[in-house]
Amino acid sequence: MRLSLLILALCCSLAANAGKTSGTYHVPEVGKSPDPEMTVLSVEDRDGYECRYVEFTVEGKRRSRERVRAYLLIPDQASETVKCPAVLMLHDHGARFDIGKEKLVRPLAAVLPHGSDDHIARSSRQWVDKNFDGVWLADSMARQGYVVLAADALYWGERSNPEAQRWSELNYADKEDFSEASDRTLDVRARKDTIKALKTRVYEGQRKVYDDLFARDVIWAEKMLRDDIASVGLLKSLPYVDTENIGAFGFSMGAHRCWMLAAFCDDVKCGVALSWMTTLDREAEMSASDYSMAVMPMREQMDFGDIGMFLAPKPMLFLNGETDHLFPKEKVEVAFEKLHDHYSENPGQLKTLFFDGGHHCGKQVQASIADYLDENLKGPKYTNPVINADYSDPDICRVGDDYYMTSSSFNHFPGLQILRSTDLVNWELIGAALTDYPGPDWDDSLPWDVLSPGLEPDEPEAPGAHEWRTVPQHGCGVWAPAIRYHDGEFYIYCGDPDRGVFMVKTKDPAGKWDDPVWLVKAKGYIDPCPLWDSQGRAWLTHGCAGSRAGVKSVLFIAPMSEDGTRLLDRSRIIYDGHRTQPTIEGTKFYEYEGRYYIFSPAGGVSTGWQTVLRSDNPYGPYDEKVVMAQNGSPVNGPHQGGWIETASGEFWFMHFQDKDAYGRVVHLQPMKWNDGWPVIGEDEDGDGVGTPVTRYRMPDLPFTGVKRPADSDEFEKPSLGLQWQWAAVPSPYWSHADASKGCLRLYSVQQSDDWKNLWDSPNLLMQKFPEDRFTVTTRISFTPNPQLKQKSEACGLVVMGESYATLRLEDSPEGIRLKMVECIDADNGSPERVVFSRAVGSEPLPVPASNVYMSTTVPPVAPLPYVETTVYFRAQVKDVPREGNVPASVCTFSYSFDGNTWHKVISDGQEYEFKVRPGRWIGAKVGLYCNRYHSKNDSGWMESDWFRISY
């Protein structure tokens, strides 16, 4: 018996590498492919890519040349300057021969005899419905930015024979569809007899193909391998393909082809093999349909898992269903173990995974395939949200290689926190633009716009500077900013729904910002955005708050001075969205390729979508289009944000998702332009409305390390970390960051006479929830003022929202007590409820040495000693599933007296669990406070040595 050239090479290679179980092996040569000489036969434009029906050359009988037809899918962005990664997609066997490439690609109707009603089109649809959850995987990959090639293997599709095609058509037509089969004169019995006879001839035909090839020193598997290598050669010849990043994917028989191709073709960078890996003894039990995959002489030398000696160290992913009846798990596990043996020196390059399901490529498996190919052909991926914390209404600008973001801060200060990134995924806090919040001078000549009936200029109905320092203005203040870089300076424009529109600017976003400049006094103006257009004009768009203005769902524009400090005319309505875009708001104003665009969310914060308005004139009229919606994804909303263009010409959109107790977390979406409209996210169905991505390739930007907004604080600096915010404009009397001691001291702040609960405390020092699950631990030392006759000082750790829970230390006539307190519906003035209480000991502080200088000429008064109580506090937050896509959040508390032994807070015989709620337009926060409730000209204090967050 003569061996094929491939098997001879394999055997020689095995002999040369005898005894080796891992490392680098000689890969046998399989010959050079002919010039592909591609011809384009037909073209169809599809959403985001082009489908070409092509013909190219492979090696035929006796070294002759054979022309093979294929589908070539090309993303719209592909060009000689923007080269895209490529994937060769290899179809399965399936005992279905009438289609091959059409098992992966939606057929091009123009080349089918009967168009979209053709038998091939129906067969293709039937196959993807059965095996791919209705998805043409090649088309999906093209929409994700891959050049994709899919060709027929020998004996499939356009390379099959009439008997095989007819048998496939009859065999896969069910009783209802039988009338659609090519021979409609057959009744059911005749159909069965015909199928049986055809089946025999089809299998005889497969054996004949194998024998004919073997007689020429070629086995069928080698023929397919050579054809697949020729397909790779075609991809390499295309000027818009990134030839360093070509991968392969195959399902079932296609997986066999994939790992053979990856082993013997250096031009394939990585491979994904789905549902074809087993042991020889299992393969021997399978049917005669395996002629196309049989490598008979090799069985005396190696098992299938030994292909790993030729694959390693090439990146490979092997997947198999837990309940795959063709490839039972116990056999596949043996093969996977052998593969891993050969990858022992490069273990990270091989992944073997089992998934729930059988011999099937469902959508979850498809996502794993795309993730793996992206990781190896496009680079690493990011996961949304990129900032899993409450940065509401984010906006972004680029300056050089850096990206800057700010967001709403409402009543929390320092406000307008500034974040910076170099890759749009890893962000760090660098500063804040608002440290104080003076309002506009209501008596000056600043223009007054009245939207609310009955509102007079001398009665602004807005909290003044005093109220902003003494009472938390929950949900008021700093709404939906826009950040821009213009003429060498950073500008932030922001709307206060009760006072008007203001602007702050700086040349250094990490440094000090100028005091606010108020452009207009108004009741209800929100969400402003400036634009300096290409004609040298400046504009300001904004929305309005129905709660203040008495109307919503309308957008405005006003001309602005070139320096951005004042409006040149009153605002006018340019768009009314009541009928089609209700609750439209959050304007972001841009000029792009000669047109004006307003990006605005509509439909509500947690339930809406992204709308874009387009016009040739700033004043309109504006066309409208929904460009991103939830579309069944886990990202509800998706809400307000801004888009950015990178230096390399990529477009990205940052927006928030309302996650209830966790606040409004930040997502990064890919964006592209199609026919003058942006498409945000991934548009799988081609309707122009994108779906938010949860995982996607990293932007084409330099990676400078993993970064995230700060959270833990050791209090070793003379100022608070940038993550901290107060519930109101802070007083310098509230705290002292003592770097010499490495601690933060909070003084007990006198609360107002009408104080009801912590919702009324302006001196809460808090930060955002940093993740869905995290643990906060802090060491608190409490020193109440012994001079206070009414013992009422308290300090503690709080998880704060419209309801809150706090573990705290309280001074009382009986001494210091540790209490667990909750307040449900604190925003409605509800009283606190104690759920746990116990006494704790105190240590007297030494008498200060300075006492020796006190006068003794008057009757001496012995000073009351200060005492200190130290307790470790801990809060553990976790997400819990509930109906819908946004999890609920719960928190438990514990305490320790030595930092080692921890005691859970117990209430009613079980561990206390608090159901976390968001605040007013914000997520829940966690932090510290120190209060007193009776007047005195001095205070006690608490000290925190550190505040540590772990995930």
PLM region descriptions:
Residues A70, V82-G94:
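Short beta-strand element of the alpha/beta-hydrolase
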Residues P380-Y951:
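Carbohydrate-active catalytic/glycan-binding domains of CAZyme proteins
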Residues V241-G250:
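Alpha/beta-hydrolase fold nucleophile elbow
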Residues E337, Y343-G379:
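C-terminal catalytic histidine-bearing segment of alpha/beta-hydrolase fold enzymes
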Residues S33-V82:
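N-terminal cap/lid segment of alpha/beta-hydrolase-fold proteins
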Residues L311, F318-N320:
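Short beta-strand/loop motif that positions the catalytic acidic residue
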Residues V202-V218, D227-S231, D267-G308, P313, ...:
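Mobile cap/lid helix-loop segments that gate and shape the active-site cleft of serine hydrolases
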Residues D92-R226, K236, E283-E285:
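Cap/lid segment of the alpha/beta-hydrolase catalytic domain
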